[in-house]
Amino acid sequence: MWPRVLLGEARVAVDGCRALLSRLAVHFSPPWTAVSCSPLRRSLHGTATRAFPLIPIVVEQTGRGERAYDIYSRLLRERIVCVMGPIDDSVASLVIAQLLFLQSESNKKPIHMYINSPGGVVTAGLAIYDTMQYILNPICTWCVGQAASMGSLLLAAGSPGMRHSLPNSRIMIHQPSGGARGQATDIAIQAEEIMKLKKQLYNIYAKHTKQSLQVIESAMERDRYMSPMEAQEFGILDKVLVHPPQDGEDEPELVQKETATAPTDPPAPTST
């Protein structure tokens, strides 16, 4: 008699736990598992999970009940884009998608891009850069931690007057590097491509820092590390902030966005 009663009570307890877990799953399941979730949110979670295995979940109270977001999706609602870690093709795809999405919502409201990156693939960084120049929104860049290599280029590419750094960040610029193997002709082709990218990057830095090409070439010949104040003097950023700016302090200058291109060789003289 007693074993049967205890077994029945255990089954009731198990059923109750299952029901409780089901209700919790409905309320607190991450939004990227929902059928109606957007591809952007699934992409955001997938890339963020590879970079950061533990993603905080934010639960909001709405008129329809509770809604859960991963922290990066919640920041995206506030028009904040995070560029964290090495810049590769997957990170570039994620950042570009967010920029285009925010422009589709409003092409006048500023976008805040927080950068903490050691750099990465040049072509991936240039894809983000071109998108920043392509969209109409003013882009406010923030350096937190470090902005090295391609990270410093993205920092400098923000809208004039809206490029910031926190006081203990580090900024580093240098020329592109790479390697090649194979036949001598293939190596020569790769070396020529790196030289073209080098000139292209010099032009971009010169455009956004207002420095001459000679100064840029000299500064980027080797790794050059800068404090935020030194980077401000160099022209990579505009302000070093300890506290968030007050309302109205970050009005961008209305300038025409132009894409910097690599210099072209002058045409060879023709003989007559």
Swiss-Prot record:
<feature type="active site">
    <location>
        <position position="174"/>
    </location>
</feature>
<dbReference type="GO" id="GO:0005759">
    <property type="term" value="C:mitochondrial matrix"/>
</dbReference>
<keyword id="KW-0378">Hydrolase</keyword>
<keyword id="KW-0496">Mitochondrion</keyword>
<dbReference type="GO" id="GO:0006515">
    <property type="term" value="P:protein quality control for misfolded or incompletely synthesized proteins"/>
</dbReference>
<comment type="function">
    <text>Protease component of the ClpXP complex that cleaves peptides and various proteins in an ATP-dependent process. Has low peptidase activity in the absence of CLPX. The ClpXP complex can degrade CSN1S1, CSN2 and CSN3, as well as synthetic peptides (in vitro) and may be responsible for a fairly general and central housekeeping function rather than for the degradation of specific substrates. Cleaves PINK1 in the mitochondrion.</text>
</comment>
<feature type="transit peptide" description="Mitochondrion">
    <location>
        <begin position="1"/>
        <end position="52"/>
    </location>
</feature>
<feature type="active site" description="Nucleophile">
    <location>
        <position position="149"/>
    </location>
</feature>
<dbReference type="GO" id="GO:0004252">
    <property type="term" value="F:serine-type endopeptidase activity"/>
</dbReference>
<feature type="region of interest" description="Disordered">
    <location>
        <begin position="240"/>
        <end position="272"/>
    </location>
</feature>
<keyword id="KW-0720">Serine protease</keyword>
<dbReference type="GO" id="GO:0033619">
    <property type="term" value="P:membrane protein proteolysis"/>
</dbReference>
<protein>
    <recommendedName>
        <fullName>ATP-dependent Clp protease proteolytic subunit, mitochondrial</fullName>
        <ecNumber>3.4.21.92</ecNumber>
    </recommendedName>
</protein>
<dbReference type="InterPro" id="IPR033135">
    <property type="entry name" value="ClpP_His_AS"/>
</dbReference>
<dbReference type="GO" id="GO:0051603">
    <property type="term" value="P:proteolysis involved in protein catabolic process"/>
</dbReference>
<dbReference type="InterPro" id="IPR023562">
    <property type="entry name" value="ClpP/TepA"/>
</dbReference>
<dbReference type="Pfam" id="PF00574">
    <property type="entry name" value="CLP_protease"/>
</dbReference>
<dbReference type="InterPro" id="IPR001907">
    <property type="entry name" value="ClpP"/>
</dbReference>
<keyword id="KW-0809">Transit peptide</keyword>
<dbReference type="GO" id="GO:0005739">
    <property type="term" value="C:mitochondrion"/>
</dbReference>
<dbReference type="InterPro" id="IPR018215">
    <property type="entry name" value="ClpP_Ser_AS"/>
</dbReference>
<comment type="subunit">
    <text>Fourteen CLPP subunits assemble into 2 heptameric rings which stack back to back to give a disk-like structure with a central cavity. Component of the ClpXP complex formed by the assembly of two CLPP heptameric rings with two CLPX hexameric rings, giving rise to a symmetrical structure with two central CLPP rings flanked by a CLPX ring at either end of the complex.</text>
</comment>
<dbReference type="GO" id="GO:0004176">
    <property type="term" value="F:ATP-dependent peptidase activity"/>
</dbReference>
<comment type="similarity">
    <text>Belongs to the peptidase S14 family.</text>
</comment>
<keyword id="KW-0007">Acetylation</keyword>
<dbReference type="InterPro" id="IPR029045">
    <property type="entry name" value="ClpP/crotonase-like_dom_sf"/>
</dbReference>
<feature type="modified residue" description="N6-acetyllysine">
    <location>
        <position position="207"/>
    </location>
</feature>
<dbReference type="GO" id="GO:0009368">
    <property type="term" value="C:endopeptidase Clp complex"/>
</dbReference>
<keyword id="KW-0645">Protease</keyword>
<feature type="modified residue" description="N6-succinyllysine">
    <location>
        <position position="196"/>
    </location>
</feature>
